[in-house]
């Protein structure tokens, strides 16, 4: 399993995600995360990767430049390593 740490306005939340599992499937039970479409087509769930890698290829909202800057759509992100993500970043776009 990969260790996921979400840095939320309410503090850090850490949990394990199995390979191939979307972090939101566990994360939404652990934290009050902003969600809307849950399909990677909007920016409600936007976060920023501090460390680690995720697969967010299902998403359509972010362009390559935003992804290179570390932005991530947490609703579709599948961790590919231990990962630390700052949540609640929609206002930055």
Curated annotation (Swiss-Prot):
GO terms for cellular component: chloroplast. It holds the Pfam family Fer2. Residues 2-91 form the 2Fe-2S ferredoxin-type domain. This is Ferredoxin-2. Belongs to the 2Fe2S plant-type ferredoxin family. GO terms for molecular function: 2 iron, 2 sulfur cluster binding; electron transfer activity; metal ion binding. One of its GO terms (biological process) is electron transport chain. It comes from Equisetum arvense (Field horsetail). [2Fe-2S] cluster binds at residues 37, 42, 45, 75. Keywords: 2Fe-2S, Chloroplast, Electron transport, Iron, Iron-sulfur, Metal-binding, Plastid, Transport. The lineage of its organism: Eukaryota, Viridiplantae, Streptophyta, Embryophyta, Tracheophyta. Ferredoxins are iron-sulfur proteins that transfer electrons in a wide variety of metabolic reactions. It is found in: Plastid, Chloroplast.
